[in-house]
A protein has these predicted regions:
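Acidic, proline-/serine-/threonine-rich low-complexity intrinsically disordered segments
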Residues: 1-11
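Short solvent-exposed coil/turn linkers within tandem alpha-helical repeat scaffolds
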Residues: 27-33, 64-70, 99-109
Length: 119
């Protein structure tokens, strides 16, 4: 089911992908791919311009799986979603949280660039 969701996402079939990832999470909340599935739910919503809902999904990744490799990516995407909603001050807070909480993550450089652009 997870791979079906990923294939649908890559084919720009975001509603189909969302459904597949939701089904996966219903049965596999603690599986190794659960943080990824939750992240992809957020990505599906983001791609459909459902930024508020995407922010909530990204928050679930951060809250439920803070040590996963998707937590820092979810924080970064939250920042992007807040920017899309023209909430620049909130985006700055999110990017700064990423720098503080995940200083060694691969999103650090991108977050620093976004912070400079938002000044």
């Amino acid at each position: 089911v997870y791979n079906k969701g990923l294939a649908a996402y890559k084919a720009n079939k975001y509603k189909e992908a969302y459904s597949a990832f939701s089904s996966y999470l219903e049965k596999n909340r603690t599986a190794p791919l659960a943080p990824n599935a939750r992240f992809w739910l957020g990505e599906c919503l983001f791609q459909q311009k459902e930024f508020e809902l995407a922010i909530l999904e990204y928050q679930k990744v951060i809250a439920d799986y803070p040590k996963s490799n998707k937590a820092s990516a979810a924080l970064y995407k939250q920042g992007e979603a807040f920017e899309k909603l023209s909430e620049k001050d909130t985006a700055k807070i999110v990017y700064n949280k990423l720098l503080a909480d995940y200083p060694k993550s691969e999103q650090v450089e991108m977050a620093q660039k976004r912070l400079k652009a938002l000044k």
